[in-house]
């Protein structure tokens, strides 16, 4: 069969991007999530301890696993409001995801440690929040199993910064 430039085709130019078509299929999901915590009041402020966990399993009714399913996660956090400082320390353990669909690769788990400390200053009728933060303090190479581009674009490495927020 001959092809001519002036003939119309089913194909369209997508600007070099991959065209993907997704179809829905029946699936069965099971899982759970929970969170427990407690707070303590002190003369200088308050402290809250929290633990949460979530896990999901799913398979297509035709047999294989549902793709890009989030792995189990455990999160521990400490929130405090002490002597005018609001502090949050959180640690999250994301498990390996080895229960994968036929078309995907397993993803390694990772540990994520984040910290933020905020102080609010009154400026007349306005307020200024100054936050010092650290994200991924362990500098882990972390990939989200749910991402289509997990291999090309891991989560950011260690990130330290200062954030200012001014309220009129």
Regions found by a protein language model. Name each.
Residues 100-101, 148:
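Short structured motifs
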Residues 4-99, 138-141, 165:
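Gram-negative outer-membrane beta-barrel transporters
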Residues 101-107:
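Short, surface-exposed loop/helix-turn segments at secondary-structure junctions
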Residues 29, 69-75, 110-114, 149, ...:
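Transmembrane beta-barrel architecture of outer membranes
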Residues 81, 108-111, 123-126:
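A structural signal for short secondary-structure junctions
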Residues 33-38, 114-120:
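Short, well-ordered amphipathic alpha-helices
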Residues 119-168:
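C-terminal beta-signal and adjacent terminal beta-strands/loops
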